[in-house]
Regions:
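General beta-strand structural signal in soluble alpha/beta enzymes
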Residues: 18-23, 41-42, 67, 131-133, ...
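Conserved thiamine diphosphate
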Residues: 109-144
Length: 187
């Protein structure tokens, strides 16, 4: 499964969510599918997308928050899983695209390439709903179930280590920040 295909498949559902995405390939691919003012591309903060998403979910419990993370990113901040589990926001869906590599910074293998299991780590940390999917149909079904579950979910999507030609977004970082803040204030 390609990460961009997974994002395209659920893109219509993201219109009604607050979306935080980690840097690099994930951010660039989501923007290439189509930018929306409810999307925040967290650049230069590897490992912190789940933390930012948690803060938004706790501050705005009436909003559905989706975090797009990567295996390299979440492995840099495993404490983020325990913090998610501690607070258990019912409005947060944490999607981890696991390509078993640090694709955006050179393609070096991550620990998941040798057997580490992010969904099992999330479950052991106390995240109430976890799943690992390996194909597009299973991803879409699991994502839809997570959106409707009203329970903190970490969904690990195993994807190919293929990304865009460039790992940057066209939207200036400050403009994204201000646009996203205006969006949240308007709700």
């Amino acid at each position: 499964m390609l990460r961009i295909d997974a994002m395209r498949a659920i893109y219509p559902q993201l219109e009604r969510c607050v979306v935080v995405t980690i840097m690099g390939a994930t951010a660039a691919e989501l923007q290439s599918v189509g930018h929306r003012p409810n999307f925040f591309y967290l650049q230069h903060a590897m490992g912190l997308a789940s933390s930012l998403g948690l803060g938004i979910a706790l501050a705005r419990p009436e909003l559905k928050v989706v975090v797009f993370d990567g295996d390299g990113s979440i492995l840099m901040n495993l404490g983020g899983l325990t913090t998610l589990a501690r607070y258990r926001p019912t409005n947060l869906v944490h999607v981890v695209f696991d390509n078993e590599s640090l694709l955006s910074v050179g393609g070096f293998p991550t620990a998941t390439a040798t057997g580490s299991d992010i969904a099992a780590m999330a479950a052991a940390a106390g995240v109430p709903r976890t799943a690992t999917v390996r194909d597009l149909a299973a991803f879409v079904a699991a994502f839809e179930a997570a959106l409707g579950a009203e329970q903190l979910t970490t969904l690990v999507a195993k994807v190919e280590a293929i990304g865009p030609k460039a790992f940057v977004t066209d939207l200036p970082l400050l403009e994204n920040r201000f646009q996203f803040a205006r969006y949240l204030k308007s709700l």
